[in-house]
Amino acid sequence: MANITVTFTITEFCLHTGVTEEELNEIVGLGVIEPYEDDNADWQFDDRAASVVQRALRLREELALDWPGIAVALTLLEENSRLREENRLLLQRLSRFISHP
């Protein structure tokens, strides 16, 4: 099964996500998403970046956060997810050593 990655130019990305170019520059500057550059040095974004921005927009709407606050919230949510997965794996390993009556 092949993985397909969709890429967007700046204009396409803004149209797809609903952010302005100014907001996109701020989002990139805060490290919320990272563009990759092709040979002609234009920013390109993948579908994962679009998902992150859509999640960020939901946070902005639901919590009335500014972009720096959203960057912090996304970082904390990602860290929480990583820690939950690590905890799940550790519990799985621990269960091998604990006998269940």
From Swiss-Prot:
Family: Belongs to the CbpM family.
Function summary: Interacts with CbpA and inhibits both the DnaJ-like co-chaperone activity and the DNA binding activity of CbpA. Together with CbpA, modulates the activity of the DnaK chaperone system. Does not inhibit the co-chaperone activity of DnaJ.
InterPro entries xrefs: CbpM
Species in which this protein is naturally found: Salmonella typhimurium (strain LT2 / SGSC1412 / ATCC 700720)
Protein name: Chaperone modulatory protein CbpM
